[in-house]
Amino acid sequence: MVKNSFISVIFQEKKEENRGSAEFQIVSFTNKIRRLTSHLELHKKDYLSQRGLRKILGKRQRLLSYLSKTNKIRYKELIGELDIRESKNR
């Protein structure tokens, strides 16, 4: 799990009002993705978890593309802090 000051700031900025923001959702999806990835390293044939992982990856990718279109600076900060690769534009 990623625990650093940036993520704690996102979680604590506006506790209840902030849950709908794209940044909060991206951070929570990233935590779920990392948890599922470590689970799948142990259980390689858990196909339902693999499907869930692919769905969460797609949701996070859509949110990241939305954030890059609306706020490029915040997008760059977020992918830098979470160690996520920048997506290729198609």
Swiss-Prot record:
One of its GO terms (biological process) is translation. It holds the Pfam family Ribosomal_S15. GO terms for molecular function: structural constituent of ribosome. InterPro entries: Ribosomal_uS15, Ribosomal_uS15_bac-type, uS15_NS1_RNA-bd_sf. SMART domains: Ribosomal_S15. The keyword rRNA-binding does not apply. Keywords: Chloroplast, Plastid, Ribonucleoprotein, Ribosomal protein. The keyword Ribosomal protein applies. NCBIfam families: S15_bact. Belongs to the universal ribosomal protein uS15 family. Part of the 30S ribosomal subunit. This is Small ribosomal subunit protein uS15c. It comes from Gossypium hirsutum (Upland cotton).
